[in-house]
Amino acid sequence: MIGVVLAGGKSSRFGGEKLLYKINGKPLILHTIERVLNAKKIEEIVIVTSKEKMKSFEKLGFSVVVDKLKIGPIGGVYTAISHFADVFVVAGDMPLINPKFVDWIVEKFHESNTLVCVPKWKNGYLEPLHAAYSQDFLEMIKRQIEKGEYMLGKAIRASSPCYIKIESLPLEWQESLFNINAKSDLKKIKGALQV
């Protein structure tokens, strides 16, 4: 399966391009990419980003695809599945992603034969940027975008997805879902990331 790393966000709360911010000498996004590549079910990595950021991310040595829609995560997922078959999508700011958890989600996705397999919190909140998507989900997203509705969660819920109950997962897998929004979040992860 292709691992797609979304890198199109504005980083407004971070105060600069957070995905290129160096942690232990490596850009934040590279920590995420390396962990996803350690998953046995992931064959290659593709970065989906805006045209403006494309050159910065190409320097990392991975394939880059431009998200021309610029409508947030739903546009990134649409771009990914319009270029590739089934994909595992992750946000570039999730450096604690656990490779075994990625493999487990991909297995559940294949077993469930659904369009999407997504982690879900007890309160109903979804983690759509840590999920597996079928290329067959493209039409559902396309219809929603054409209606001017850009909430990825709405399209996922309408697809009768495979849900993964987050609270029942091992703690280290739950930590996979932690993302960096502000510089203060860096303190929480520096010890967990190896040089």
UniProtKB/Swiss-Prot annotation:
Alphabetical GO biological process terms:
Mo-molybdopterin cofactor biosynthetic process
| One Gene Ontology cellular component | cytoplasm
Q: What is its EC number?
A: 2.7.7.77
Q: Where does Mg(2+) bind?
A: 93
Q: Which GO terms describe its molecular function?
A: GTP binding; metal ion binding; molybdenum cofactor guanylyltransferase activity
Domain of life (superkingdom): Archaea
Task: Describe the reaction catalysed, as an equation.
Answer: Mo-molybdopterin + GTP + H(+) = Mo-molybdopterin guanine dinucleotide + diphosphate
Principal location listed in the UniProt entry: cytoplasm
Q: Which residues bind GTP?
A: 6-8, 18, 67, 93
Q: Which Pfam families match?
A: NTP_transf_3
> What subcellular locations does the record give?
Cytoplasm
> Which keywords fit this entry according to its UniProt record?
Cytoplasm, GTP-binding, Magnesium, Metal-binding, Molybdenum cofactor biosynthesis, Nucleotide-binding, Transferase
Cofactor(s), by name: Mg(2+)
Q: Does the UniProt entry include the keyword Cytoplasm?
A: yes
Q: Briefly, what is this protein's role?
A: Transfers a GMP moiety from GTP to Mo-molybdopterin (Mo-MPT) cofactor (Moco or molybdenum cofactor) to form Mo-molybdopterin guanine dinucleotide (Mo-MGD) cofactor.
Q: What is known of its domains?
A: The N-terminal domain determines nucleotide recognition and specific binding, while the C-terminal domain determines the specific binding to the target protein.
Q: Which family does it belong to?
A: Belongs to the MobA family.
The protein, known as: Probable molybdenum cofactor guanylyltransferase
- Give the species this sequence originates from: Thermococcus sibiricus (strain DSM 12597 / MM 739)
